């Protein structure tokens, strides 16, 4: 990798570099991009091309999330915009559909509301990309969102807390109620549902809520007095409510201080809805209502009616008799013309506005009817606020010079809004001071501001500009209007033609169809289309296989199985069956099984001992076996072949002597032999007997049978019908009425499906033969045949030789009783009514998890359908993650589409933070497929960029680490590079308890911390490594977990171990002396699997030779490179044979050697017994252990017959015997007995210096069987021979240990786990940078190899 160009600095602005960087971003992999950016230019992350795009912009556009996160960690500016369109990286990632990159940017603080040059934010881009089939209409199912100060509980959230942004009124969404109109007032709110029901909430004094009392309602409550009336419109003011029904009736309730209710005689208040009945309204159809604080307005197509306090807003003059209030509805005479046809009416506290179909707008105020505008055609909505009331009319409630200025808003079908204000007394069209065009679909008005809803579902809040403003503000307005791409010809006369409105976008409004506000502007409501409106990916439930499963149970029934509990012998055939299935379908069989063997009252059936499986055996007489088989087929499957049109039954109706031996004997007994028969032929005798038999049959035949002259005795359909009646199967008998046997085949004339009988746990409870027990102790008696037929899980459990099949105790299921009940109900009824009716999403998810575990596919699909119906903006991300985790594919697809359709709302609410990286990737792919325009948004890789083929996959990580450590000294930099080289080959950990992983053997580092002995390139072959019984393959080393990697740094801190290295003698490698290792103080003997420091060998030519063990600190220990190893091996080879000590014993350096290599070393040691007397050695060879029994999973402990204490004593004697002449210092040990208590291992970064200043590790040297750090001073000749008795004793000990381990109770294991966790907390093991603490169980000795034993053999 070449270094950056010499003329490149941190302020580089080279266009060539920018093009190279962007080219690599478009065509390189993530690691290649990282490597190139780290090496090509010092300013690669921020350098821009001619369009103002930098690497961050292109990475976001291409969806390279790994590079994006890498750049964010580098601290690049995330808010920088390009020159072309003013887009940030967030704009670009949304435009190209990379939601995973969007979420990374949002997590790092990028705002969604930053606008580009066209005034579009990132959310606006999502809105513009919405699929074309998504259109929001007033007729859609809608949800109510409210916000405001909520002083009087008018928002319906159940609390008095204020809301700063729109929040869902969840009462309606939970109940499936859709609202089409909301009216907000000071003390209460009114909600009208699409089904015509009225709900109110707020303060109830005066009866304004209409519930029959004056209690306050925190959440919306149904007005029961209007049940049975389909309401079409509501209006409300401060103290009363007006409701219009579809049939033109008007109901009012609330305070009637000003006679605004229109009820005669006028009550002071009315707390239930009462209909307005006036003679002026007879024969009139009211089409609309409106309400102000002091009055109520009704109108038809031809006239307007008002009632209430007459302060000038009723459209009539003062009463000359001094009547201040109009009690009954009175028509406005000023609007009583032949040509007037009313279309819209609105009212405020002090004014009334009427609109005709001709476009004339009239204002009723100050006891006058003024025409404010004309020819305003196609108006869809009109609003009014403010107004002045005559103070003298009611001084108690009115203030002198009170009221506000009148403002009228009108919206036409094209979305244009017109405004009339008493300030300028002219109707002006509104212009929006907003960077882009907006198209209005609904408006709302209060005394301070205007609220808008656009056709794209957005919400805005608008305010009038001040009359007096600075010149700079005027310039800003004009520039904003110019940017809105609208006609600017009005600018010269802007003050007189247009009303200027400054807009502010509402948050969390993305599907709005309607908006409303209270008159004071304190509380607001917005109706948004249901987020599932455009969802078409709906899960489907597969067809039922209920009867097919029971048919399979019947076909697989056998005399020897353990599922059937009754057998029927019909003729010479046996039919194994199941009592519960027969008894639940037939009262005959239910009584038979209740008789307990007493069959005297049953004809043609009796009990006979038991069958081969020990079940009850019943003999059925006078029934054809094939007929009984068809009967069983119908019982189990609700159908049979005789109900299939065109079926040709293959049934032998002629009596077989073998099958009906008893019947034949009875016929023979009836034959009369006379003396006259001696002279007759056999045929004549037979013919006479047949005639006699026929006559007897006719005599014995009942009279009722004479009617069925055309029923043949050989008709199989009638025979089956007779059998069905005999065994009380009326359903089959009635269905066979429409079946005929013609031309040797079945002809179905009329299909009679009948009523399908549902199974139930409560039916025939005396036949329950298995009990399920839930995890909370609740028991469910069940029937084994149903469980085995419906679920393979129970079939495998109860039909085999498992202990559950024969146990009389309840079967404990690790499932809660509520969930287990749903599972069992589904198995019996093939339905899940509880799931369909449940509103608890968590419960349904729990059932889905259990259904997935038990492989109940159809129940899982039912849960998916139920969860899809309960998808909301709050739980969509959670359900998507849940569906991905449990492979609920249909639910996942629905969640993906739901999130894609509501992407703007979910991004603004930050609801996607629960998604994992993989699920976010899937969401990005689905979102790009969902948007058709994404197919054209493809960034073509630049072809003219630099060649990056030389960059390897790992280069990005290498250069990242190099850049981080660039300012460190040279030695530390080289140290890091050596570490990354060692990390190039990935390591894998084995999950087994012992043995090596193949990748660990092949990819192990060339040096493990101690210098190799032997010849150059003397590396064991793979078979030798796998089959060697040397100390290196000792089971105590076991898994690769016990062999710490030299580059393993995270969380480990250990003291450094220093030892003196004697100068080379004749080019030989250094040999270490036991004197150089200082004994540690008070160090306990550690576990075998404790982390061990791995020494690293570095030769320092400028100072005295020394070796330092690797420290498990955040800085990785140095690793001996290949060149050093080759030099050492070369020096060894020059020296000749393996060096020997003056003791005549072989020096082992911890390398795992084969048996052949050990023999060669031993021979070399005997031959070369001189020349090395000046050297001191350290013996690191572990104690020899027998070969493990199982080569694939070797035991973690030694299987030697000697105890650990024997080894210590033996080693101590050996060291003592040579201490005088060898100058080898003894190493003290403190052994502890193995116990159940956990051991704590500390790897401290603060070592204890020895007398000579050397740091000694806290880790023991000889207690661990690790081949790198263990030693053995026992010569092979001193090992005692292994006897057969010791082997047998050892095997018995291992068997006993295995039994103890296997029968260890779960409670004890849990206690130990709690103890381990408590110790970890006590010793501050978590997040401790100074110490690495391990708490583990101590081993209890070797265990025998587990063996599978099959019972019953």
Swiss-Prot record:
One biological process term in Gene Ontology: release of sequestered calcium ion into cytosol
Keywords: ANK repeat, Cytoplasm, Membrane, Nucleus, Phosphoprotein, Repeat
Segments annotated as ANK repeats: 51-80, 85-114, 806-835
MF (Gene Ontology): protein kinase binding; protein tyrosine kinase inhibitor activity
Tissue: Expressed in DeFew, HEK293T, HeLa and in Jurkat, MC3 and NB4 lymphoid cells (at protein level). Isoform 1 is the predominant isoform expressed in all examined tissues and cell lines. Highly expressed in hemopoietic tissues (fetal liver, spleen, lymph node, thymus, peripheral blood leukocytes and bone marrow). Weakly or not expressed in other tissues.
Subcellular location: Cytoplasm; Membrane
BTB domain location: 564-644, 768-836
Keyword Cytoplasm among record annotations: yes
Biased composition (Polar residues): 992-1001
Record field: compositional bias (Basic residues): 976-988
Phosphoserine PTM positions: 990, 1004, 1030, 1033, 1039, 1045, 1054, 1083, 1111, 1113, 1116
A cellular-component GO term for this protein: cytoplasm
InterPro entries attached to this UniProt entry: Ankyrin_rpt (IPR002110), Ankyrin_rpt-contain_sf (IPR036770), BTB/POZ_dom (IPR000210), RCC1/BLIP-II (IPR009091), Reg_chr_condens (IPR000408), Signaling_Regulatory_Domain (IPR051625), SKP1/BTB/POZ_sf (IPR011333)
Annotated segments matching region Disordered: 970-1001, 1134-1155
Superkingdom of origin: Eukaryota
RCC1 repeat segments: 141-194, 195-246, 248-301
Membrane topology note: Peripheral membrane protein
Task performed by this protein: Acts as an inhibitor of BTK tyrosine kinase activity, thereby playing a role in B-cell development. Down-regulates BTK kinase activity, leading to interference with BTK-mediated calcium mobilization and NF-kappa-B-driven transcription.
Oligomer status and interactors: Interacts with the PH domain of BTK. Isoform 2 does not interact with BTK.
Name used for this protein in its record: Inhibitor of Bruton tyrosine kinase
Organism listed in the record: Homo sapiens (Human)
Gene it is expressed from: IBTK
């Amino acid at each position: 990798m070449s270094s950056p160009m010499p003329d490149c600095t941190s302020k580089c602005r080279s266009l060539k570099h920018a093009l190279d960087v962007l080219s690599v971003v478009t065509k390189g992999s993530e690691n290649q991009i990282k490597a190139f950016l780290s090496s090509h230019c010092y300013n690669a992350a921020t350098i821009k091309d001619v369009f103002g795009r930098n690497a961050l912009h292109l990475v976001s556009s291409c969806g390279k999330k790994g590079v994006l996160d890498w750049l964010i960690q580098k601290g690049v500016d995330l808010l920088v915009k390009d020159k072309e369109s003013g887009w940030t990286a967030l704009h670009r990632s949304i435009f190209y559909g990379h939601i995973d990159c969007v979420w990374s940017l949002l997590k790092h603080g990028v705002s969604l509301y930053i606008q580009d040059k066209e005034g579009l934010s990132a959310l606006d881009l999502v809105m513009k990309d919405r699929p074309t089939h998504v259109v929001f209409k007033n007729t859609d199912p809608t949800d109510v969102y409210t916000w405001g100060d909520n002083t009087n509980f008018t928002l319906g959230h159940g609390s008095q807390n204020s809301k700063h942004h729109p929040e869902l009124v969840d009462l309606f969404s939970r109940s499936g109620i859709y609202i089409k109109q909301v009216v907000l007032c000071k003390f209460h709110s009114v909600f009208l549902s699409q089904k015509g029901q009225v709900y109110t909430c707020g303060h109830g004094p005066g009866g304004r809520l209409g519930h029959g009392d004056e209690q306050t309602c925190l959440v919306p409550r149904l007005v029961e007095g209007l049940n049975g009336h389909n309401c079409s419109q509501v209006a409300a003011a401060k103290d009363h409510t007006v409701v219009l029904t579809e049939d033109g009736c008007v109901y009012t309730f609330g305070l009637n201080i000003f006679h605004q209710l229109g009820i005669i005689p006028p009550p002071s208040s009315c707390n239930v809805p009462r209909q307005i009945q006036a003679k002026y309204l007879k024969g009139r159809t009211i089409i609309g209502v409106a309400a102000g604080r002091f009055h109520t307005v009704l109108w038809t197509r031809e006239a307007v009616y008002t009632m209430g306090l007459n302060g000038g807003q009723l459209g009539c003059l003062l009463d000359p008799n001094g009547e201040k209030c109009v009690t009954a509805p009175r028509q406005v005479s000023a609007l009583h013309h032949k040509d007037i046809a009313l279309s819209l009416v609105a009212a405020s506290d002090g004014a009334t506005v009427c609109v005709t179909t001709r476009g004339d707008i009239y204002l009723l105020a100050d006891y006058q009817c003024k025409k404010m505008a004309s020819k305003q055609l196609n108006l869809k909505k009109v609003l009014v606020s403010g107004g002045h009331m005559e103070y003298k009319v009611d001084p108690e409630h009115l203030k002198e010079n009170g009221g506000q200025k009148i403002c009228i808003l009108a919206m036409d079908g094209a979305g244009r809004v017109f405004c009339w204000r008493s300030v300028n007394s002219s109707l002006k069209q509104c212009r929006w001071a907003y960077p882009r065009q907006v198209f209005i679909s609904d408006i709302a008005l209060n005394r301070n501001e205007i609220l808008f809803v656009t056709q794209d579902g957005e919400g805005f809040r608008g305010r009038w500009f001040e009359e007096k403003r600075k010149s700079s503000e005027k310039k800003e307005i004009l520039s904003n209007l110019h940017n809105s791409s609208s006609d600017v010809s009005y600018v010269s006369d802007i003050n007189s033609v247009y009303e200027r409105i400054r807009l502010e976008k509402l948050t969390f409004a993305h599907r709005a169809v309607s908006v409303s506000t209270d008159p004071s502007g304190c509380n607001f409501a917005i109706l948004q289309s249901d987020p599932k409106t455009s969802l078409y990916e709906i899960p489907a439930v597969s067809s039922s296989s209920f009867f097919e499963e029971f048919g399979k149970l019947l076909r697989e029934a056998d005399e020897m199985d353990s599922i059937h509990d009754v057998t029927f012998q019909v003729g010479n055939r046996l039919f194994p069956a199941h009592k519960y299935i027969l008894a639940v379908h037939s009262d005959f069989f239910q009584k038979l099984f209740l008789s307990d063997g007493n069959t005297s009252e049953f004809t043609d059936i009796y009990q006979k001992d038991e069958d081969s499986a020990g079940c009850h055996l019943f003999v059925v007489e006078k029934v054809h076996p094939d007929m009984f088989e068809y009967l069983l087929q119908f019982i189990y499957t609700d159908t049979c072949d005789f109900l299939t049109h065109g079926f040709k039954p293959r049934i032998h109706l002629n009596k077989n002597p073998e099958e009906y031996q008893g019947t034949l004997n009875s016929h023979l007994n009836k034959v009369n032999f006379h003396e006259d028969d001696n002279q007759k032929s056999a045929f004549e005798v037979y013919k006479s007997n047949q005639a006699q038999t026929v006559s007897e049959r006719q005599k014995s035949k009942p009279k009722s049978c004479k009617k069925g002259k055309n029923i043949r005795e050989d008709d199989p359909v009638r025979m089956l019908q007779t059998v069905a009646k005999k065994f009380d199967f009326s359903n089959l008998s009635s269905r066979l009425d429409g079946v005929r046997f013609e031309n040797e085949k079945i002809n179905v004339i009329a299909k009679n499906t009948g009523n399908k009988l549902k199974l139930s746990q409560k039916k025939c409870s005396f036949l329950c033969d298995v009990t399920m027990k839930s995890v909370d102790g609740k028991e469910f008696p069940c029937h084994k045949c149903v469980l085995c037929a419906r679920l393979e899980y129970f079939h495998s459990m109860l039909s085999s030789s498992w202990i559950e099949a024969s146990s009389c105790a309840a079967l404990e299921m690790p499932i809660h009783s509520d969930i287990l009940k749903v599972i069992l109900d589904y198995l019996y009824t093939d339905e899940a009514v509880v799931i369909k009716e449940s509103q608890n999403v968590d419960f349904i998810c729990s059932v889905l998890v259990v259904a997935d575990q038990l492989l109940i596919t159809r129940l899982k699909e039912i849960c998916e359908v139920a969860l899809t119906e309960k998808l909301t903006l709050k739980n969509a991300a959670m359900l998507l993650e849940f569906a991905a985790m449990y492979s609920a594919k249909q639910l996942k697809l629905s969640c993906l589409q739901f999130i894609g359709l509501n992407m703007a709302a979910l991004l603004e609410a930050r609801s996607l933070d629960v998604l994992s990286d993989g699920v976010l990737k899937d969401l990005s792919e689905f979102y790009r497929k969902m948007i058709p325009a994404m197919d054209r948004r493809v960034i073509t890789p630049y072809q003219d960029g630099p060649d990056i083929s030389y960059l390897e996959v790992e280069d990005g990580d290498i250069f990242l680490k190099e850049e981080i450590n660039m300012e460190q000294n040279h030695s530390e930099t080289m140290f890091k590079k050596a570490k990354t080289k060692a990390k190039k080959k990935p390591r894998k950990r084995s999950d087994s308890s012992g043995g090596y992983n193949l990748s660990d053997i092949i990819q192990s580092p060339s040096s493990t911390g101690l210098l190799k002995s032997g010849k150059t390139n003397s590396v064991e072959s793979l078979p030798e490594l796998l089959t060697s019984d040397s100390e290196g393959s000792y089971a105590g080393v076991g898994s690769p977990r016990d062999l710490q990697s030299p580059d393993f740094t995270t969380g480990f801190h250990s003291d450094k171990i220093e030892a003196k290295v004697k100068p080379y003698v004749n080019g030989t490698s250094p040999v270490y002396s036991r004197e150089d290792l200082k004994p540690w103080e008070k160090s306990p003997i550690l576990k075998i699997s404790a982390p061990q420091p791995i020494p690293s060998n570095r030769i320092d030519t400028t100072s005295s030779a020394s070796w330092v063990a690797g420290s498990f600190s955040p800085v990785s220990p140095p690793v001996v490179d290949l060149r050093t190893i080759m030099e050492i091996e070369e020096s060894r080879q020059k020296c000749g044979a393996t060096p020997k000590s003056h003791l005549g014993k072989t020096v082992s350096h911890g390398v795992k050697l084969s048996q052949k290599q050990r023999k060669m070393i031993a021979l070399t040691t005997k031959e070369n017994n001189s020349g090395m007397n000046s050297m001191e050695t350290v013996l690191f060879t572990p104690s020899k252990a027998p070969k493990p029994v199982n080569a694939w999973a070797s035991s973690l402990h030694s299987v030697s017959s000697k105890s650990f204490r024997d080894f210590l004593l033996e080693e101590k004697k050996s060291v003592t015997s040579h201490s005088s002449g060898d100058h080898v210092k003894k190493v003290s040990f403190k052994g502890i007995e193995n116990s159940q208590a956990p051991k704590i291992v500390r790897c401290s970064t603060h070592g204890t210096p020895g007398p000579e200043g050397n740091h000694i590790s806290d880790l023991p040297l000889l207690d661990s069987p690790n081949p790198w750090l263990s030693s053995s001073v026992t010569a092979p000749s001193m090992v005692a021979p292994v006897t057969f008795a010791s082997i047998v004793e050892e095997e018995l000990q291992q068997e006993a240990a295995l039994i103890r381990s296997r029968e260890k109770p779960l409670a004890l294991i849990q206690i130990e786990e709690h103890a381990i966790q408590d110790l970890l907390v006590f010793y501050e093991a978590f997040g401790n940078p100074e110490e690495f603490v391990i708490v583990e169980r101590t081993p209890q000795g070797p265990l025998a190899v587990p063996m599978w034993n099959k019972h019953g053999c």
